[in-house]
């Protein structure tokens, strides 16, 4: 037997040991434990604002920490900063590449970033002395498209890429300080833990991984999806996360139990999920779908509690405000809608 075969065998044995250990931990299901909890009831949200101004498909949006301003990125080659209270555009930033896939608002509110098919992550300073928005740094280093980016602070940002890696950047120097390798497919999405010490990533290898930001190590790998994971989002307490996939399911994974807790699916739902987000308490899971709808799931019961219907094309992105008071959805119909 060749050395490679021996190693393969060893890896299989280790995988089986992990599977058995996980089974031993799974002494109850989430459905059993939440059986006595009242259902959340029918969730009916209304469109409170429609943000009009983009001229093409919207691909991404991200709320600022003030729960008022948000940034959106569109195929029209613009980043727009919106005031969600008044629907006014605070800034419209022309991009060098219109093939944008992600955008992010820094926690401080001083910067926004975006990225896409040009493999570069430009950082824009919103608070210049002159009052104009300008590129403060362009982060180049990925060898594939940028699928997602999230600021840790004004000088650090994490990116995920189609080159199968994630990276932590020092914005001032423009250098990758850590590269997170381990996925075997395009990384599509990332979500920072509430304490910012770790993050999760979802990829086209149908797995999700938990990473330690400072050590650059993969801590855990979660499998279960049958197709690409397009979206990922941490549970508000940081102990679990949800994923959305092309296999038409959302799933809830628990870090401490090291396994899947729940599947959110319905026989009538046969299209992929583009985006996921939790309500402030975590009781509701919102998911955007290719069929133009956004479904609201009861996280504990896996029942569908409501639908946000109003877009005329695929819901490509969604986000819940930090204060938990509103949801924004962005769509290929070129509009953003604010619901509550």
Curated annotation (Swiss-Prot):
The keyword Glycoprotein does not apply. Keywords: Repeat, Transducer, WD repeat. Belongs to the WD repeat G protein beta family. CDD domains: WD40 (cd00200). PROSITE patterns: WD_REPEATS_1 (PS00678), WD_REPEATS_2 (PS50082), WD_REPEATS_REGION (PS50294). It comes from the Eukaryota. GO terms for biological process: G protein-coupled receptor signaling pathway. SUPFAM superfamilies: WD40 repeat-like. The keyword Nucleotide-binding does not apply. One of its GO terms (cellular component) is heterotrimeric G-protein complex. This is Guanine nucleotide-binding protein G(I)/G(S)/G(T) subunit beta-1. GO terms for molecular function: signaling receptor complex adaptor activity. WD repeats lie at residues 53-83, 95-125, 141-170, 182-212, 224-254, 268-298, 310-340. Guanine nucleotide-binding proteins (G proteins) are involved as a modulator or transducer in various transmembrane signaling systems. The beta and gamma chains are required for the GTPase activity, for replacement of GDP by GTP, and for G protein-effector interaction. The gene is gnb1. Coiled coil: none annotated. It comes from Xenopus laevis (African clawed frog). InterPro entries: G-protein_beta_WD-40_rep, Gprotein_B, Guanine_nucleotide-bd_bsu, WD40/YVTN_repeat-like_dom_sf, WD40_repeat_CS, WD40_repeat_dom_sf, WD40_rpt. G proteins are composed of 3 units, alpha, beta and gamma.
């Amino acid at each position: 037997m060749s050395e490679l075969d021996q190693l393969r065998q060893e890896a299989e044995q280790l995988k089986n040991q992990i599977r058995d250990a996980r089974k031993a931990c799974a002494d109850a299901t989430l459905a059993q434990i939440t059986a006595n909890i009242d259902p959340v009831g029918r969730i009916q949200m209304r469109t409170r604002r429609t943000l009009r101004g983009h001229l093409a498909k919207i691909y991404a949006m991200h709320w600022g920490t003030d729960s008022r301003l948000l940034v959106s990125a569109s195929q029209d080659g613009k980043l727009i900063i919106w005031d969600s209270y008044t629907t006014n555009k605070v800034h419209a930033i022309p991009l060098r590449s219109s093939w944008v896939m992600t955008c992010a608002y820094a926690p401080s509110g001083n910067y926004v970033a975006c990225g896409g098919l040009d493999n570069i992550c430009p950082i824009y300073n919103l608070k210049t002395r002159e009052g104009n928005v300008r590129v403060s740094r362009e982060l180049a280093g990925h060898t594939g498209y940028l699928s997602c980016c999230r600021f840790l602070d004004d000088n650090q940002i994490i990116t995920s890429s189609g080159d199968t890696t994630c990276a932590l950047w020092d914005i001032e120097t423009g250098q990758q300080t850590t590269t997170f390798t381990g996925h075997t497919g395009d990384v599509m999405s990332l979500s920072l833990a509430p304490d910012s010490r770790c993050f999760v990533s979802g990829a086209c290898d149908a797995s999700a991984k938990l990473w330690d930001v400072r050590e650059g190590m993969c801590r855990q790998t979660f499998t279960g999806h049958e197709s690409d994971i397009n979206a990922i989002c941490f549970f508000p307490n940081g102990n679990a996360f949800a994923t959305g996939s092309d296999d038409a399911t959302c799933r809830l994974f628990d870090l401490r139990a090291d396994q899947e807790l729940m599947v959110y699916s319905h026989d009538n739902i046969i299209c992929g999920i583009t985006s996921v987000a939790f309500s402030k308490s975590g009781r509701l899971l919102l998911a955007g779908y290719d069929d133009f709808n956004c479904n609201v799931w009861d996280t504990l019961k896996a029942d569908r509690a409501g639908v946000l219907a109003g877009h005329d094309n695929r819901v490509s992105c969604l986000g819940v405000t930090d204060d938990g008071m509103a949801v924004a959805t962005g769509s290929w119909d070129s509009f953003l809608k604010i619901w509550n």
